[in-house]
Amino acid sequence: MKHLPKHLRPRWRYFAVGIETWPDADLGRRGFQRALWYAAGNLLGDAGSADADLTLLSFSHDGGEGEAIVRARHGHVDDARATIACVSEVDDEPVGVRVRGISGTVRACEERYMGRAGGSSTQRDVAFEGAERSAVVREDAYDVWTGSAYVGAAAFDTE
């Protein structure tokens, strides 16, 4: 079978997506793709999600920070952006996602928007609610371990 001429091939847009979770969350590629498909199905319906054709091309997550590249059809950029924003939970773990940028090629997407994680994270003991507690510190955000779960705090909450 012959290849389609260039002007008949489908055009794609590539979304660089930043992912933020609690430090102990364990996210996988398969779970994120499933959450993306469910969000597309719920927001756009079956026909709309099939037209947008959202596909996860690359995924990495470690220590509460991650990034992904999501592919969508050229005419469905707004739908894809809204769908990505609707992802709030992956494998029963709460997540925060944001679109860092959109590009026409995978290479440009990686060069411009990937590798810009929120900085390094460090483990510290902080004073929180009158007690010494362990916390993961990322820039000005503190994820304080309370014994059963993490609590998000700012710098002035830990003094």
Curated annotation (Swiss-Prot):
It comes from the Archaea. The gene is rnp2. Its main location: cytoplasm. It holds the Pfam family RNase_P_Rpp14. This is Ribonuclease P protein component 2. It catalyses: Endonucleolytic cleavage of RNA, removing 5'-extranucleotides from tRNA precursor. One of its GO terms (cellular component) is ribonuclease P complex. Gene3D superfamilies: Ribonuclease P, Pop5 subunit (3.30.70.3250). The lineage of its organism: Archaea, Methanobacteriati, Methanobacteriota, Stenosarchaea group, Halobacteria. Part of ribonuclease P, a protein complex that generates mature tRNA molecules by cleaving their 5'-ends. It is found in: Cytoplasm. GO terms for biological process: tRNA 5'-leader removal. Its EC number is 3.1.26.5.
